[in-house]
Design a protein with these regions (language model features):
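Gram-negative/organellar outer-membrane beta-barrel architecture
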Residues: 1-105
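C-terminal outer-membrane beta-barrel translocator/porin domains of Gram-negative envelope proteins
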Residues: 76-206
Length: 206
């Protein structure tokens, strides 16, 4: 697995314009009946973000952010691309970000609305194509997503005897107004983030 990221920010007064582009590739061999099967994939992501600091004092600050995004992913088996797994999503996101300093602790909160528009070369999701571009009530995902998200995190240092420790907590929620593709659903994580989880199966939800 390998990846690269490029980021550039241009501040102007209370405004900030930023651009981020990244890509990653991975390759793995899976055991098959007639020998190892080569499975590979790659992804490309880009976003342009405009933010504005709307309030700030010595204990808190609030920022509004508008960004346009494009993300693409594809997978291949034995050098043959899987058409159903070639996904391109483009759209915009508006968010309200707040940071509160409470003593030595930092509390962050974000409310956001993400909208897939079909722009930036987006492709209909495989789920849309299978059900006539959204004509079926059993549609399981769309590239024109409508998604609300909320996130709160707390980072607080503390001492236990002579030991200096730090608490980090994160709560995340989302509310979908459209069926979501796997890339936008919640997942339990992987073998490196959940103890005792082998990664062979996954638990996902919208």
């Amino acid at each position: 697995t390998e990846g690269q990221t490029v980021h550039y920010s241009l501040p102007y007064g209370y405004w900030m314009l930023g651009f981020t582009a990244s890509n990653s590739q991975y390759h793995q061999s899976v055991a098959g009946f007639n020998g190892p099967i080569s499975y590979a994939g790659k992804s490309n992501n880009a976003e342009v973000k405009l933010s504005r600091l709307v309030y700030r004092d010595q204990s808190r600050k609030t920022t509004v952010v508008l960004k346009g995004f494009r993300r693409e992913s594809r997978n291949v088996i034995e050098d043959t691309e899987l058409p159903d797994q070639h996904r391109v999503v483009g759209g915009w996101e508006f968010s309200l970000n707040h940071r509160e300093f409470i003593g030595d602790a930092t509390l962050d909160g974000t409310l956001a609305y993400k909208r897939g528009t079909g722009g930036f070369g987006a492709r209909p999701a495989a789920e849309e194509i299978a059900f006539g571009n959204g004509a079926s009530p059993f549609l399981e995902g769309t590239s024109r997503l409508k998604l609300y998200t909320a996130e709160v995190s707390l980072n607080a240092p503390f001492k236990l005897g002579e030991e200096k420790l730090r608490y980090s907590g994160l709560v995340r929620a989302q509310w979908n107004r459209t069926p979501l593709t796997p890339q936008d659903r919640f997942a339990i994580g992987g073998r490196y983030t959940v103890r005792g989880f082998d990664g062979e199966t996954s638990l996902m939800g919208e």
